[in-house]
């Protein structure tokens, strides 16, 4: 095909398809860089393929694996039948690639589809070339790349593509009044809700804004009102078969009998659609939010009356913490300058093309990251990318109005240079963003070996970070995972890992048996059920009773319980312990925990003191610590020569002190911790290899992870 010399004015279908293919290939190739880099490390491989880089991905991988097998265990929390698991199952059924290869590369290809709606939206405004530049930028912007790179096997791979397709149908409808687009809008909403159920609020906001836009700009056009009615039906909680049948039926009636449909019928249809939405429970999420904020005080009081109080998991998750404005701008547009130009361009785009206002819900959700956490930034990426593309158009248009003459050749060269420099920060980010796999091959092998020792109904007690991978590799059940980690859920695993071995063993058995019972009894609070069944007046009294080695269980043992203790958990030990350090009766912290892991960075040859990378100094021949100028005596210095053999040297220094200093020779790392954490089951059983053989049997003994079977 011979391209026009002034390609910025070309909006032909062939030209558009070529740009889409180029942008798609560019996006995929950028995501393959990580594969090339990671392939150099054998510890990232398992079963002859690179492993994935996201914990949540193992949930969908487990679901897909179970779908391929054709079954899963009752109450095993498998994502059997979930959207991504289903799509993976379909691909595995028709493609000649291994399961591991499919889940590794899916995000690279599906996430790159974002270029399609970006370029097509720009084409609706006769700005295809500028849309191409926007697609290049948006497809690899920092936050979007981070959550859709190769190996990032998660629903994020389509979480922007689908709402952008919805936005495309909105814009196309406002410009062309295309009746086929009338059908696409509700269909894309249905697909988006199936793919990502949490998209309900965004869908609701987009439909609401489209309704407001209709009343302001298209109040006399029937096709817009019918679109609203069909989208409301798509948003309802009816089974998808009924929704699709109803949508197609109404579409067909409008397509063939439009002249006989008046506004009274349209408004009646909208009323019926809202009624269907309400009766099917579609308004419940909205009503819940209103109830929570309007009647907040009484709701909180009722919550206190109904259950115990636990540590809030949101305080431990980086993605829900507020972020620095500069980081916010870089995550959306890869650089501060491009972000500013993109924002200006978006304002100009909305000024010149009112239909772009329909993108505000996505932009607002992305900007929520300033308060709600960095995970939301991706929603603003494609909208701001379109803003940048339009800024370039406005810039060249400004030059023409000022009669600044540029030849077509110079204009094209300048446009290419601007495009290159705008995406350069994103390319640099891709080069330096070298994410590791969730587990190493050694850790995956340890869990895979457990599959041959444990039964599918057995439980592995571990921290929630490892729940999904454990279920995937070991094919067992877990108490908590990436989707089940509220304070009341985390309490039990935290207790088992951070308390001494006797209460930990008792709680491990109780938490598993009561979790299984809760599937039938539907306990709102499992700990409260324990307290009630054992006739205790408070959670504190019940938890203290677990210190008895002869504790009598009222429940029968129904399965084996394993405890997974990886080395990688050591760095987050204070977070793990925080949940069980909270008194469920009043929500207060029982004690102030002290824990830090650090490496030596320098040694004073004169005094012999050792400076650690956390700012702490080891002084007086390893007998005290210097923290912010204050000297803190040590209770003991423990030199751990071998984690697997339990070979260590215990040097008591001050029996009245509370702080221990541990040196891990195998990792060349220091651990500073208080007495309660030193006596915890995790430190004793993993680092020191000291375990009560009446309570536990060691199944796996490795420097990377240990697994114990509960004998109780």
Swiss-Prot record:
GO function term, MF aspect, one: oligosaccharyl transferase activity
Binding site residues for [alpha-D-GalNAc-(1->4)]2-[beta-D-Glc-(1->3)]-[alpha-D-GalNAc-(1->4)]2-alpha-D-GalNAc-(1->3)-alpha-D-diNAcBac-tri-trans,hepta-cis-undecaprenyl diphosphate: 196-198, 293, 375, 468
Periplasmic compartment segments: 38-98, 147-154, 195-199, 236-239, 281-327, 373-376, 433-712
Span of the annotated motif MI motif: 569-576
Biological process annotations from GO: protein N-linked glycosylation via asparagine
Disulfide linkage: none
Motif interval(s): TIXE motif: 316-319
Catalysed reactions listed for this entry: tritrans,heptacis-undecaprenyl diphosphooligosaccharide + [protein]-L-asparagine = tritrans,heptacis-undecaprenyl diphosphate + a glycoprotein with the oligosaccharide chain attached by N-beta-D-glycosyl linkage to protein L-asparagine
InterPro entries: Oligo_trans_STT3 (IPR003674), STT3-PglB_core (IPR048999), STT3_N (IPR048307), STT3_PglB_C (IPR041563)
Subcellular location: Cell inner membrane
Function: Oligosaccharyl transferase (OST) that catalyzes the initial transfer of a defined glycan (GalNAc(2)GlcGalNAc(3)Bac(NAc)(2) in eubacteria, where Bac(NAc)(2) is di-N-acetyl bacillosamine) from the lipid carrier undecaprenol-pyrophosphate to an asparagine residue within an Asp/Glu-Asn-X-Ser/Thr consensus motif in nascent polypeptide chains, the first step in protein N-glycosylation.
Name under which the protein is recorded: Undecaprenyl-diphosphooligosaccharide--protein glycotransferase
């Amino acid at each position: 095909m011979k391209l026009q010399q002034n390609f910025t004015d070309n909006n032909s279908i062939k030209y558009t398809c070529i740009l889409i293919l180029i942008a798609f290939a560019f996006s995929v190739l950028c995501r393959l860089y990580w594969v090339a880099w990671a392939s150099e490390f054998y510890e990232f491989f398992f079963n002859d393929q690179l492993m994935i880089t996201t914990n949540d991905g193992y949930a969908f991988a487990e679901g897909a694996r179970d779908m391929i097998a054709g079954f899963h265990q009752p109450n095993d929390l498998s994502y059997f039948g979930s959207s991504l698991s289903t799509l993976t199952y379909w691909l595995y059924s028709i493609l000649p690639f291994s399961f591991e290869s499919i889940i590794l590369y899916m995000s690279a290809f599906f996430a790159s589809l974002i270029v399609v709606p970006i370029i097509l939206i720009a084409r609706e405004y006769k700005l295809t070339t500028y849309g191409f530049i926007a697609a290049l930028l948006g497809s690899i912007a920092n936050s979007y790349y981070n959550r859709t790179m190769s190996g990032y096997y998660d629903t994020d791979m389509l979480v922007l593509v689908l709402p952008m397709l919805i936005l495309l149908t909105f814009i196309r409808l406002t410009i062309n009044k295309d009746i086929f687009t009338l059908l696409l809008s509700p269909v894309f909403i249905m697909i988006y809700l199936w793919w990502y159920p949490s998209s309900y609020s965004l869908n609701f906001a987009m439909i609401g804004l489209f309704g407001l836009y209709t009343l302001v700009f298209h109040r006399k056009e029937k096709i817009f009102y019918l679109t609203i009615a069909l989208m409301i039906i798509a948003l309802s909680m009816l089974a998808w078969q009924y929704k699709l049948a109803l949508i197609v039926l109404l579409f067909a009636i409008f397509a063939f009998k439009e002249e006989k449909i008046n506004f009274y019928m349209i408004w009646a249809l909208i009323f019926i659609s809202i009624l269907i939405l309400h009766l099917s429970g579609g308004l419940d999420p909205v009503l819940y939010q209103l109830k929570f904020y309007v009647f907040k005080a009484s709701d909180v009081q009722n919550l206190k009356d109904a259950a115990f109080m636990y540590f809030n998991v949101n305080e431990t998750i980086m993605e829900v913490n507020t972020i620095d404005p500069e980081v916010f701008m870089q995550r959306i547009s890869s650089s501060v300058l491009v972000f500013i130009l993109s924002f200006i361009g978006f304002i100009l785009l909305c000024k010149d093309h009112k239909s772009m206002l329909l993108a505000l819900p996505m932009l607002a959700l992305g900007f929520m990251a300033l308060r709600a956490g960095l995970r939301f930034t991706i929603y603003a990426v494609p909208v701001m990318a379109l803003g940048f593309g339009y800024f370039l158009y406005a810039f060249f248009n400004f030059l023409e109005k000022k009669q600044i003459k540029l030849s077509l050749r110079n204009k094209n060269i300048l446009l290419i240079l601007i495009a290159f420099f705008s995406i350069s920060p994103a390319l640099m980010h891709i080069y330096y963003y070298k994410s590791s796999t969730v587990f190493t091959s050694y850790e995956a092998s340890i869990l895979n070996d457990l599959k041959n020792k444990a039964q599918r109904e057995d439980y592995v007690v571990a921290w929630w970070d490892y729940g999904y991978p454990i279920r995937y590799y070991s094919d067992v059940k877990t108490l908590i995972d990436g989707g089940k980690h509220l304070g009341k859920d985390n309490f039990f695993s935290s207790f088992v890992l951070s308390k001494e071995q006797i209460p930990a063993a008792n709680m491990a058995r109780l938490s598993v048996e009561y979790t299984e019972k809760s599937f039938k009894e539907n306990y709102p609070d499992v700990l409260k059920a324990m307290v009630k069944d054992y006739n205790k007046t408070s959670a504190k009294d019940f938890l203290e009773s677990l210190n008895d080695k002869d504790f009598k269980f009222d429940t029968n043992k129904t399965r084996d319980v394993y405890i997974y203790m990886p080395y990688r958990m050591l760095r987050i030990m204070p977070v793990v312990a925080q949940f069980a350090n909270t008194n469920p009766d009043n929500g207060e912290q029982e004690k102030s925990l002290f824990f830090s892991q650090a490496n030596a960075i320098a040694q004073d040859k004169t005094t012999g003191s050792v400076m650690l990378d956390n700012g702490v100094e080891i002084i007086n021949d390893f007998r005290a610590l210097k923290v912010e100028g204050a000297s803190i005596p040590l209770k003991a210095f423990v030199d751990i020569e071998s984690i697997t053999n339990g070979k260590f040297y215990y040097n008591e220094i001050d029996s009245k002190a509370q702080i221990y200093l541990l040196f891990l020779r195998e990792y060349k790392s220091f651990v500073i911790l208080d007495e309660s954490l030193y006596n915890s089951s995790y430190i004793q059983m993993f680092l020191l290899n000291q375990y009560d053989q009446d309570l536990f049997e060691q199944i796996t003994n490795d420097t990377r992870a240990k697994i114990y079977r509960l004998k109780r």
